[in-house]
Curated annotation (Swiss-Prot):
Keyword match Glycoprotein: no
Domain notes: The N-terminus of helper component proteinase is involved in interaction with stylets. The central part is involved in interaction with virions and the C-terminus is involved in cell-to cell movement of the virus.
Motif window: Involved in interaction with stylet and aphid transmission: 362-365
Top-rank EC class of the record's enzyme: hydrolase
Provenance organism: Zucchini yellow mosaic virus (strain California) (ZYMV)
Protein name: P3N-PIPO polyprotein
Family from the record: Belongs to the potyviridae P3N-PIPO polyprotein family.
Active site per UniProt: 223 (for p1 proteinase activity), 232 (for p1 proteinase activity), 264 (for p1 proteinase activity), 652 (for helper component proteinase activity), 725 (for helper component proteinase activity)
Length: 991
């Protein structure tokens, strides 16, 4: 019988039949009869069974509804499709089902059905039990004792990866005291300073000194640096370091009489005699001496003034500072110095110069130094002068030789004040109560002269500036030049606002009074997408502040879009950065038939001075129009209203075309923008001249006449870089420019006229590189490229005048016969330009005969006045006209100035400059000549060989040397071939 072990008690298990026949009476009653739980008899009535029957019917009905819902074909398909779906991670971390397509589901169902049928057939035993013999399938060569490989053609062996063994770092384990001792030994042997760091900012530098053949540790203490402390070194912080120092040093030989100045900071160990005698601590760091003996720097001293510190002697400290600063300020030596004077004389010299400029009782006294600092500059100079007078005899006795004369003279002049005030008072009486400009200038000059050596540099600069202005005025007054007429020129800006009919028409305004672009805004995308750059405010405005153009930079005020809420900072944002302000010159005006064209001139104030531009505040998403009057702000098109655009570099003139688009009819906006994009912008390119922009505006005005009255954006004139700045909605942080008065497109079109005499029409809109340098490079390049030179002769004949900067360029152009071609082209078109080419050709013949560079430059300078006279009568419609005119003017003025200097016997110091410029020009010519086309070189060489072959037949075979000389001469003329490397030349030399 089976049993169960409960602890050490075995309980038998009765069989099932026995358990079934066992009566209840045999069970043991564990619970008392009074506490036995009894089950109440169930009282189930008819209502109970009726209610349960209804619940059962409802449950069966719900099950039938659910089965009918899931038994539909659509629901079965959805369940099957969900069963075939895969889980994937969706956005925000959600888990979603990736459901297959319907075709995939049906194909999968067919595959599963076919698999079930195949499995059922297989389980029923309906399968082919035949065995296929491999010998029938494989070829005969494979079935006889040959290994058959089952590898696919893509099989590739996997190589065993080599494990890289990483070398473990070997860490040396040693106690801290042992490590410290080793470090100190290394520092001792190699004389390396060791920095000892305690708590907070407590630091001491440890060095090792040799004394009587042994090492002594020396610690830096406070009194060596001039700082007095009651306790100079904390023993608790550095006691273990002091112990380690004593282990690596030997101080047994140090006696008490060896402690002298310079021994501060020496560390003595516990067993040393001096430590036992003078220290209450285990170690002794020497500080100095007092009445009781040696003082320990580790112990507290109540009255440190009573301690005689053992630092270096005062004389040694003085000369250490003297040597350190004296060597820093000494000049570069140009000879080998010798000790010609003893130290006593050198000390006297240093003392007298020190007292002359810094008179004190003691240099170490702080009160003496403060007394010199607290006085004013005038009082300081008076005290130096008084000191100089008091010690006049000492100065005279010290002044032995003339080597000190300049020093004494400098001190005397710097300390003396102006004594003759009578003449200054007379000048003041004459100019008093006069408010004219010239009288005020004389007052400023007189004030500077009255102060004499006490005058400040700012006052002296002001006096010189006033003197310069007076000189210029007097020169103009005496010579009665044409500048006098320019001084009477006035061009005040209009006090009335300009009226634009397109902005006043009610049909083109919305309910807020803003301009409605309509179709114009849609077609403006052609300009915004191609030639404007989008400004993203989240990336900041810093990269858009500096506006580069090839001849300089200008700062935009786009950074001011971030408005500070502090009033002081807001006022600071209204200040601009000014450039050098230019006065009113002939470049500021435009004339036609001897009359001023005021709309093409710079705006002036009431007194005739030019009106300088002020800070132009920026705005977002606007088109700003209105030149010299109050600006008008037009919202950008609705499609671009949420974006900020800035024109790309070199295309700021497109703001003019956008301003013209405001006046274009909506049905013509498409043609207008397409013409700008496809025709005008490729023709203008980057940084076009104002004349070209005006011509483009004229072309647009022909096709769209309504744009002629369109208002222009603000245009600033930069005469320094010859640039026109078209200001957009981001304003300008740079101020000080002149303001162009042109307010409409009609005014701008006047710059396109050839009859208009104006320098501004050649300015670049947005900037231009230095024109003269660019034109010179183009001229040198065209010398060796005939096609390019012919194009230059037709388009810009004045460019050949730039060849007068160098005799080399003139000779090259003469040899290549460019002057002859210029005469042939222009002798019938323009007689004056043809005359210029004739003069240049005659000048080059003279220059070629001169062998010295100075003579060649003199010939060029002599021909400059005649050419300048002819140039003034020519038309200025070419881009090289202004640079060529400036070049001739500079040469004429330089020759006139140098003539007076040479007459008075002064040398001309510009010869070195001319030599270097000639070398650079020759180098540039050689570079461009090396880049000439290879075909041209081959043709020239073949022509030379053909000439030599033709003439060589008539030569006597014995006279081959003459043939070689002719060949070398022709090669040197052409400059395309080196005769020393030519095969023909070598053949002649061998013959």
């Amino acid at each position: 019988m089976a049993s169960i072990m409960i602890g050490s008690i075995s309980v038998p298990i009765a069989k099932t039949e026995q358990c079934a026949n066992t009566q209840v009476s045999n069970r043991a009653n564990i619970v008392a009869p009074g506490h036995m739980a009894t089950c109440p008899l169930p009282l189930k009535t008819h209502m109970y069974y009726r209610h349960e029957s209804k619940k059962l019917m409802q449950s069966n009905k719900s099950i039938d509804i659910l089965n009918n819902f899931f038994s539909t074909d659509e629901m079965k398909f959805r369940l099957t499709r969900n069963e075939m779906s895969k889980l994937k991670k969706g956005p925000s971390g959600r888990i979603v089902l990736r459901k297959p397509s319907k075709q995939r589901v049906f194909a999968r169902i067919e595959q599963d059905e076919a698999a079930r049928k195949e499995e059922a057939v297989f389980l029923e035993g309906n399968y082919d039990d035949s065995i296929t013999n491999l010998a029938r399938v494989l070829p005969p060569a494979v079935t006889h004792n040959v290994d058959v490989s089952l590898r696919s053609p893509f099989y590739k062996r996997t190589y065993k990866k080599e494990r890289k063994k990483v070398a473990q770092k070997q860490i040396v384990q040693a106690p801290l005291n042992s490590l410290c001792t080793r470090v100190l030994k290394i520092a001792r042997n190699k004389n390396i300073p060791v920095e000892m760091i305690g708590n907070k900012k407590t630091r001491h530098t440890l060095t090792f000194k040799r004394f009587r053949g042994c090492f002594v540790g020396k610690v830096s203490v406070a009194h060596e640096e001039g700082r007095m402390r009651h306790t100079e070194m904390s023993y608790e912080q550095f006691k273990w370091l002091l112990k380690a120092i004593c282990q690596v040093t030997h101080t047994e030989r140090i006696r008490e009489e060896d402690i002298k100045p310079g021994c501060s900071g020496w560390v003595l160990g516990t067993n040393h005699t001096l430590t036992k005698r003078y220290s209450r601590l285990p170690h002794l760091v020497i500080r100095g001496r007092d009445d009781d003996g040696i003082v320990n720097a580790l112990e507290q001293v109540l009255f440190y003034s009573e301690v005689d510190h053992s630092s270096s002697q005062p004389e040694v400290q003085f000369f250490q500072g003297w040597r350190r600063i004296f060597d820093k300020f000494r000049p570069s030596p140009d000879h080998v110095c010798k000790a010609d004077h003893n130290n006593e004389e050198c000390g006297e010299l240093a003392a007298i110069f020190c007292q002359a400029l810094f008179p004190v009782v003691k240099l170490s006294c702080q009160t003496c130094r403060e007394s010199l600092v607290e006085v004013s500059f005038e009082e300081f100079k008076d005290s130096l002068n008084a000191n100089f007078i008091i010690h006049k005899d000492e100065w005279g006795s010290f002044k032995e030789g003339s080597q000190y004369d300049n020093i004494f003279k400098l001190i005397k002049v710097a300390t003396q004040a102006t004594q003759n005030l009578k003449l200054s008072s007379e000048v003041m009486k004459l100019v008093q109560n006069h408010t004219s400009t010239h009288m005020k200038q004389i007052q400023d000059i007189n004030k500077a002269l009255m102060k004499g050596s006490l005058v400040a540099q700012d006052e002296l600069d002001l006096a010189l500036k006033q003197l310069l202005e007076m000189t210029q005025w007097f020169k103009n007054h005496m010579h009665l030049t044409g500048e006098e007429a320019l001084k009477m020129f006035r061009n005040k800006r209009s006090s009335k606002a300009m009226i634009n009919p397109s902005l006043l028409c009610g049909n083109q305004l919305d309910k807020n009074g803003n301009f409605v672009w309509g179709e114009r805004g849609y077609h403006s995308k052609r300009l915004f997408k191609n030639f404007f750059e989008e400004v993203i405010p989240s990336e900041g405005y810093t990269k858009y502040v500096v506006r580069n153009f090839p001849n300089g930079t200008r700062k935009l005020a786009i950074g001011s879009l971030i408005v500070p809420l502090n009033l002081d900072r807001a006022r600071t944002a209204l200040l601009g950065e000014s450039i050098e302000k230019k006065p009113l010159t002939s470049a500021c005006v435009s004339q036609q038939n001897g009359n001023y064209i005021h709309s093409c001139c710079c705006v002036t104030m009431d007194d005739g001075t030019p009106m300088y531009s002020e800070l132009k505040s920026p705005t977002k998403r606007h088109l700003v129009i209105g030149a010299s009057s109050d600006p008008k702000y037009i919202d950008l098109p609705a499609s671009e209203a949420e974006r900020m655009y800035i024109a790309k570099e070199g295309y700021c003139y497109l703001s003019i075309f956008l301003a013209m688009l405001v006046n274009v009819n909506e049905n013509e906006a498409k043609d207008f923008t397409k013409m700008i994009r496809d025709v005008l912008i490729p023709m203008l390119g980057q940084w076009p001249s104002l004349m070209d922009v005006a011509t483009a505006a004229y072309i647009l005005g022909v096709f769209h006449p309504e744009t002629r009255c369109a208002e222009l954006p603000r245009i600033l004139v930069d005469h320094a870089t010859q640039t026109m700045h078209v200001i957009d909605s981001y304003g300008s942080l740079t101020v000080g420019y002149h303001v162009l008065k042109a307010g409409t497109v009609n005014h701008l079109i006047q710059f396109a006229s050839n009859d208009l005499q104006s320098e501004m029409k050649h300015y670049r809109v947005g900037g231009t590189p230095t024109q003269r340098i660019k034109l010179e490079e183009q001229l040198i390049k065209g010398i060796f490229k005939p096609k390019l030179m012919m194009q230059l002769l037709h388009d810009d004949p004045y460019i050949l005048l730039l060849g007068m900067i160098s005799p080399t360029i003139l000779v090259h152009m003469y040899r290549m016969r460019h002057f002859e071609r210029g005469i042939e082209i222009w002798i019938k078109r323009d007689h004056e330009i043809g005359k210029i080419f004739v003069i240049l050709e005659q000048l080059t013949r003279k220059v070629a005969l001169a062998e010295v560079l100075v003579d060649q430059l003199n010939l060029i300078s002599e021909a400059s006045p005649h050419l300048l006279e002819i140039m003034k009568g020519c038309q200025d419609n070419q881009r090289a006209y202004v640079p060529a005119l400036d070049l001739l003017t500079i040469q004429v003025e330089r020759e006139f100035s140098n003539k007076e200097l040479k007459t008075n016997g002064y040398p001309d110091l510009q010869q070195t400059l001319f030599d270097m410029r000639e070398k650079n020009v020759c180098k540039a010519a050689a570079q461009f000549m090396a880049r000439a086309k290879l075909a041209g070189k081959i043709l020239c060489n073949r022509a030379i060989e053909a000439i030599l072959d033709f003439y060589g037949k008539k030569f006597n075979p014995a006279s081959k040397r003459r043939k070689a000389r002719i060949f070398a001469t022709i090669c040197s003329r052409v400059f395309y071939h080196d005769p020393s490397t030519c095969e023909e030349h070598s053949r002649c030399r061998r013959a």
